Amino acid sequence: MSEDFYDVLGVSRDATEDEIMQAYRDQVSEYHPDVSDDPDAEEKFKKIQKAKDVLTDEETRQQYDQLGHERFEEAEKRGATGNGGGGAGGMGGAGGPFGGGMGGGAGGGMGDIFEQFFGGAGGGGGRGRSGPEQGRDLRTDLTVTLSEAYRGVSKQVTVRRPESCADCGGSGYPEDADVRTCPQCDGQGVVTQVRQTPLGRVQQRQECSRCGGEGELHSETCSTCGGQGQTRERATLTVDIPEGIRTGQTLRMDGEGAPGEPGAPNGDLLVDVTVEEHPDFERDGDDLHHRHAVSFPQAVFGAEIEVPTLDGAATFDLDAGTQSGETFRLKGKGMPRLRRRGNGDLYVTVQVVTPESLSDEQRDALEQFAEAGGEEIDVEQGFFEKLKNSF
């Protein structure tokens, strides 16, 4: 039974990526075959490398935690884990005529089978690498106010991301380290394996696991990055928020993700945007909704009403006899349409406010108003209470 990856590195199951990388560096400095006298150093180093690769990849680590060590290794042999390429689907998958682990995934077919037999690095259904690997994408969150989403704004975000190691220039070893030809691949960077298949004996070329395809070994690794060529650093970047951005939308910053392998581009930084709620406006797509209080006389006689917008005050005509709850539309006073021309609308719902207290003169006037309309006034309740209870 092989050893659990967390135990290999000596970390807890809830260890952070930084803790895992630190444990990896400590183990590498002790068991790297080029610096260790331990006769089992090479085998231990492979285990350490494998444990680090699995536990520092978010998707693969999640699969590992869900499956457990033994089931994960079985799935990996079949090519069913996150970085292993195709799974059990397609021709030659689990239960297929060519046995487990050779499927190209759903939609694989004969091309994947012959690629597995005759070319490509790695096994278990994966495709061979055609060149340096692009850096992975990173994600971060950013919150903006509704006013900032209305006008557009430039904001700064700080992210922790891999950077090329400043001490070794990304090579993974010091400049003065001794160099020798890798004995496992004779300096070729690849090794050839002969396999017996249903089609006969075939040769498969794989990237050398000892030197990582470089064909050379170095007497020591960089103490700063543990031989990885990368360190995690904080980077402060400026994000341009376009007018009309909405919650849940994502902005892509090209080339601001993790660095790629030498000769390959960096990944991208994906910024997930959240727009804060506003105390005066409720957003509905590109439209805004606002509740506005008007007085009883304004509702009765009509008036020019001033309301706030995200671009300053605006006015509209309140019709005489307006009832509480009626809505008025102010065209073009809503949010800008993202990467399109024009704005949405502002919908103002009026709320007729009943005064909480009246002077004697105001009370007499309202009672006369009611009597003129033929309404009977309950002396005990009074017109004001009657009016207030009618809303």
UniProtKB/Swiss-Prot annotation:
Residues 53-79 have a biased composition (Basic and acidic residues). Keywords: Chaperone, Cytoplasm, DNA replication, Metal-binding, Repeat, Stress response, Zinc, Zinc-finger. Residues 81-94, 119-129 have a biased composition (Gly residues). It is found in: Cytoplasm. Binds 2 Zn(2+) ions per monomer. Its cofactor is Zn(2+). It holds the Pfam family DnaJ. GO terms for cellular component: cytoplasm. CXXCXGXG motif repeats lie at residues 165-172, 182-189, 208-215, 222-229. Belongs to the DnaJ family. Participates actively in the response to hyperosmotic and heat shock by preventing the aggregation of stress-denatured proteins and by disaggregating proteins, also in an autonomous, DnaK-independent fashion. Unfolded proteins bind initially to DnaJ; upon interaction with the DnaJ-bound protein, DnaK hydrolyzes its bound ATP, resulting in the formation of a stable complex. GrpE releases ADP from DnaK; ATP binding to DnaK triggers the release of the substrate protein, thus completing the reaction cycle. The J domain is necessary and sufficient to stimulate DnaK ATPase activity. Zinc center 1 plays an important role in the autonomous, DnaK-independent chaperone activity of DnaJ. Zinc center 2 is essential for interaction with DnaK and for DnaJ activity. This is Chaperone protein DnaJ. It comes from Halobacterium salinarum (strain ATCC 700922 / JCM 11081 / NRC-1) (Halobacterium halobium). The gene is dnaJ.
